[in-house]
Amino acid sequence: MKIKSILLCIFLLGSLTVAHAQEDASTVLQTAYTQAKKENKKVFVIFHASWCGWCKKMEKNMQSPSCKKLFDNNYVTTFLTVQESPKNKNLENPGAADLLAKYKASGVGIPFWVILDTDGTLLTDSFNSKGENLGCPATAEEVGEFVTKLKKTSKLTKAQLDVVSQVFTIKK
């Protein structure tokens, strides 16, 4: 009887974990705005998904030892999960897809990112000068446009922007 009770408890706890929904997008953003106001930073929002290799690359680059402090000193970075497969829909932040649509980015691929002020006003996004999503910038041209956007929305110096450029540019 004891074993059945223990197994039942494990099953129920496992079910609760699977059923746990993600925070809605507005809550995630409100938390980021509050922190950014306190720290005098901008909000860097990245729309991503668990299956997205370029999303993982973007996060890895931003969290690299060379870049982490540079981004952390200038931005409150937050992630909104979108475009998950049917079996992983529970990973999505409710309202994130609507927010992606608001930025006219529903069909442009991910990662898609925006940089906002503490009131939620759009300062820049990941569209390049041709209207294409930079996503995780990797070519010299993409990284150049990314760095220009960072320069306009941060206090990063030329030397610091050069570090970001080196980390993001794919070496051939």
Residue spans for each PLM region:
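Non-catalytic, surface beta->alpha helical segment in thiol-disulfide oxidoreductase systems
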Residues: 102-158
